[in-house]
Amino acid sequence: MERWSINESAKIYNLPNWGADLFSINKKGNVCVHPSPTSKHSIDLRALVDDLIKRKIKPPILLRFMDVLQGRIASINRVFKNAIDENDYPATYQTFYPIKVNQQRQVVEAIAKFGKRYNIGLEVGSKPELVIGISFATGNGIPIICNGYKDTEYIETVLYATKIGYDITIVVEKMFELEKIIALSKKTGIKPKLGIRVKLSSKGTGKWATSGGEDAKFGLRMSEIIAAIGLLEQNDLLDRVKLLHFHIGSQITKIDKIKSALIEGTRIYAEMRKLGVGIRYVDIGGGLGVDYDGSKSSYFSSVNYSIEEYANDVIYQIKNICEDAGVECPNIISESGRATAAHYSVLVTNLLNTNTSNAMPDFEETLNGTEKLAPTVKKLVDIYKSIDRYSLREDYHDTVQLIQEAVSLFNLGYLTLNERAMAEWLHGKILRKINGIVEKIKPIPEELQNFQLSLRQTYFANFSLFQSIPDSWAIDQLFPIVPIQRLNQKPDVMASIADITCDSDGEITSFVGENGRTKYLPLHKMRKDEDYFVGFFLIGAYQEILGDMHNLFGDTNAVHVTFNKKTGYKIDTVIHGDATWESLKYVQYKGPEILKHVRDTLEKDVALRKVTIEESSHFLELLDRTLLGYTYLGE
């Protein structure tokens, strides 16, 4: 076996650069998770998954590491505290978690609990999210910011929550919304705590750039701000405006775009203060990105700045503009949901098989006796025997031409099925031989840099891409994917990952690699009777809630894990994934009705002796077991 180290594995998956010091590889070759970047403690992912399977918790399994979530909250607050101290900033910083990032009860509950020491708030954008926010704020004093479109019911709920004593701010997104708020305030006699969202000309970058700029969906234009101030003053509500909000998009990849937005947004704040609006908070929205591919670049799956640089720029730019304008520095709020939640969640699942088969015919004899072979096949044999590093380019080009020729000859009836199969087999042998030579050549000839795609095998994984990582399909988002074991061995397969849905789009063909995006994932050959697991990392933001029910594959099993010094880990919560009957219920089918319909039909067939009682009973038992079982694949 070729010598290989865990450091080499870490390098080819670029783990040190995207892992934020939260993931490593141990001496066994297994991926480990750390509770914080500075912690020496870790959990062996493969050992954890093996233990969960013994507990009858089957893959795919969504692992939520709650200490990592707590650590991310602490990190964001720590870097802002440091930036405030270094810049002698005279006001405060506060984090608000946007519930839309992941609305799962246990997740919001953990964030509310961990964030209490930092006075963390919740941002809501709909009536259901408002109810969630109120439920967590009850008895806890958690502040709430209300964004999004609002109807009468939404606004009235906020007004009465204000009256009862909740710390809740309703953000004006549109002028018609302000008019409705004023009317309902008069009707109820309740004065709300108000925020105003402004539409900046500054825009973000990447997939969410349209969240900012003149054509942004939300926010008031400059002329509308002037009109809003006048309207609020007329209705004795100007003193209720406490917050200014702007947002130029999620996953902002370039720090200069953030600086531009901060400068413009703070200038608007300063001018509004001069007009007599007593704003105390500036909410800079989200946008703090995650380096999914570890490239530290402005590519949309990365960011060209650190969290420390982000915090320093926020504090410096706001202070600088306020001092220049001669106005009081505001308290700062950010809604960094992606940066808070992305790292804490890992999906682990088993690989089922590949698109290659051990039952493939072996044409080794063709390498010896070539007299009876078709000329095209004979030429392929000759190339295979003679190829070396000096003839690589020519032999590669000839091989491509000959395999195309073989297909054409077969279609015209001049090659038999057996001869075409021989040509395919030889094509694969030649490419693998070329690859063995190319791996030792530096630099790789330009014409050969993409030929490895011809060797890429498809590994089928027990999951639904559309359910578990929908952004991979919808917007071509990169997520790190790494085998969680055997990383002390050199990977010997170049693979793509296909899910188990009946959809050709359910395949991942772009991966995080050593030098950025790559078209294949290095994996190991699967061994008979041995499970092989891969982990999908940095999926804690948006993926769970955006997932859909394609082919009726439902929610996966989810396990909440915390670190324990004595036992290594502690399982806090197990949330079982959807059974088949639950998935069917989403689309208005009822398991008992299905069983009754089938049973009634089978009873008629038994009476007519089309089936036996035993066959009928066995089929109903299988159907019942399927309804009660996991939607994903078992043995």
UniProtKB/Swiss-Prot annotation:
Positions that bind substrate: V282, D283, I284, G285, G286, G287, L288, G289, V290, D291, Y292
A Gene Ontology BP annotation from the UniProt entry: putrescine biosynthetic process from arginine
Lipid metabolism as UniProt keyword: no
Keyword hit for RNA-binding: no
Classification via CDD domains: PLPDE_III_ADC (cd06830)
Catalysed reactions, semicolon-separated: L-arginine + H(+) = agmatine + CO2
Pathways involved: Amine and polyamine biosynthesis; agmatine biosynthesis; agmatine from L-arginine: step 1/1
Coiled coil: none
Xref: PROSITE patterns: ODR_DC_2_1, ODR_DC_2_2
Required cofactor(s): Mg(2+); pyridoxal 5'-phosphate
UniProt EC number: 4.1.1.19
Modified residues (N6-(pyridoxal phosphate)lysine): K100
Keywords, comma-separated and alphabetical: Decarboxylase, Lyase, Magnesium, Metal-binding, Polyamine biosynthesis, Pyridoxal phosphate, Spermidine biosynthesis
GO molecular function: arginine decarboxylase activity; metal ion binding
Reported function: Catalyzes the biosynthesis of agmatine from arginine.
NCBIfam families per the UniProt record, alphabetical: PRK05354.1 (NF003763), speA (TIGR01273)
Family designation: Belongs to the Orn/Lys/Arg decarboxylase class-II family. SpeA subfamily.
Protein's name according to its UniProt entry: Biosynthetic arginine decarboxylase
Natural source organism: Geobacter sulfurreducens (strain ATCC 51573 / DSM 12127 / PCA)
Gene from which this protein is expressed: speA
